[in-house]
Amino acid sequence: MKVLVINAGSSSLKYQLIDMTNESALAIGLCERIGIDNSIITQKRFDGKKLEKQTDLPNHKIALEEVVKALTDSEFGVIKSMDEINAVGHRVVHGGEKFNSSALINEGVEQAIKDCFELAPLHNPPNMMGISSCQEIMPGVPMVAVFDTAFHHTIPPYAYMYALPYELYEKYGIRKYGFHGTSHFYVAKRAAAMLGKPEQDVKVITCHLGNGSSITAVKGGKSIETTMGFTPLEGVAMGTRCGSIDPAVVPFIMEKEGLSTREIDTLMNKKSGVLGVSSLSNDFRDLDEAASKGNQKAELALEIFAYKIKKVIGEYIAVLNGVDAIVFTAGIGENSATIRKRILADLDGIGIKIDEEKNKIRGQEIDISTPDATVRVLVIPTNEELTIARDTKEICETEVKLRSSVPI
C-alpha cells in the first residue's frame, strides 16, 4: 500500500508518499506561497534526486495537481500514475471533543472538522481545503483525518478543565485540548522501545520543541497532561508566542495600547515569545550566536525559554509520580545541544544528568544521559508523517474487512 500524507497550511502544502510495505518515504515535497506570487514546488526522492519548479499555485487544488504531476514525473517521479496512490492521510489540527482517534473521512467527519473552525481558525480551514481538493482530484480514493488533538483525549477532566464558570465549557467547549499529539504519540512509543519496556509500564515526559513548543506527560502510552490548551498559545514560551501569562495582562495592555481583540491576539501569537523578548529573532540559532557575543536580551530570551520548560518537567514528574525518561524532539529539541543543556542544567538532584559529548550528536535516536543517571534523556527525531500513514493504512484495511464481512 502507498499512502500520500498531506499537511495543508494556509499558503503551503507539505506531502510525503510512503510505501507501507517497508514504511519508507518514496518522496517528500513542499508547495510554498500558495495564492501568492512566486509560488514554488520542491520534491526530493528517496535517492536524493530533487525537483524544484516555480509555477503558479493560485489555490490548494492546483497545488495538489502539481503534487500529482511531480510524483508521476518521468524524470523526478516515483510512481507511474495516480492510481498507485491507495489512500490519503490528512493532518487535521483540531478535532474538538468529537474525535479521540483518527477517522475515515465522510460527510459527517467533514462537518465535524468544519464545526471546529472557530477553535482553530488558522489551521482547520486550510486542512479542510486540502481534503476537499484531494477529493476532487482523487475521487474514490479513501481518505483519513488524523487529529493533533486526539492523543490528548485521555487527559482527565480535572486537568483539562479551566476554573471558569462551567456554563462556558457547556456553551463554547472552553477547555484544554492540547496539540502536537501525533508527535508526542510517536516519540513516546519510540521511547518505550529504546528503554526496552512495555508501553504500559513507561512514564515519559515528551518535549516537542520547535517554533511552536509543547510538553506532554505520558503514562502507559497515554497523555495525562500537556502544556498547550484551548489554543496552541498556552504553555511554555515559544518562538513568537508568549505562552501562559497572567490573564489580567491582556485587558491591561489593550487599554494602555488601545488595541483591538485581533491586535492583542496578533501581539501574543506573532510578536511575543523569544522574538518579543530579544527584539531580534525567533530563530534560536540567531539567538545563540547573539547571546555568545554578549547580547543580553538574546540571553534573557533563551533563559526564559529554558526555565519555563525546566519548570514544567518538574511539575510533570510530580504528575507522573516519577519518570523513566525525558524525550526531546522536533526542530529545536532534536538539533540544539545548547538548548537541551540549558533546560537540563542543575537537575542532577532528581537523577537527570547528560553526557556532554553524546549531547552534541544530531539527527539520530540516542540516549544522551550518563550511565549513573536514574532518569534517561532521549533525543528522538519525530515522524508525524509515518504515524499518519500508519493510522491511514490501519483504518482503510479495517474498512475493507468490515465491508467484506457484510453478507450480500
Swiss-Prot record:
One of its GO terms (cellular component) is cytoplasm. Keywords: ATP-binding, Cytoplasm, Kinase, Magnesium, Metal-binding, Nucleotide-binding, Transferase. Its cofactor is Mg(2+); Mn(2+). Homodimer. Substrate binds at R91. Disulfide bonds: none annotated. It catalyses: acetate + ATP = acetyl phosphate + ADP. Mg(2+) binds at N7, E384. CDD domains: ASKHA_NBD_AcK_PK (cd24010). Its main location: cytoplasm. HAMAP family: Acetate_kinase. It comes from Methanosarcina mazei (Methanosarcina frisia). Pfam families: Acetate_kinase. Belongs to the acetokinase family. The keyword Ribonucleoprotein does not apply. One of its GO terms (molecular function) is acetate kinase activity. Pathway: Metabolic intermediate biosynthesis; acetyl-CoA biosynthesis; acetyl-CoA from acetate: step 1/2. PROSITE patterns: ACETATE_KINASE_1 (PS01075), ACETATE_KINASE_2 (PS01076). GO terms for biological process: acetate metabolic process; acetyl-CoA biosynthetic process. Catalyzes the formation of acetyl phosphate from acetate and ATP. Can also catalyze the reverse reaction. Mg(2+). Can also accept Mn(2+). This is Acetate kinase. Its EC number is 2.7.2.1. It is found in: Cytoplasm. The active site is at D148 (proton donor/acceptor). The record marks H180, R241 as: Transition state stabilizer. ATP binds at K14, H208, L209, G210, N211, G212, D283, F284, R285, G331, I332, G333, E334, N335.
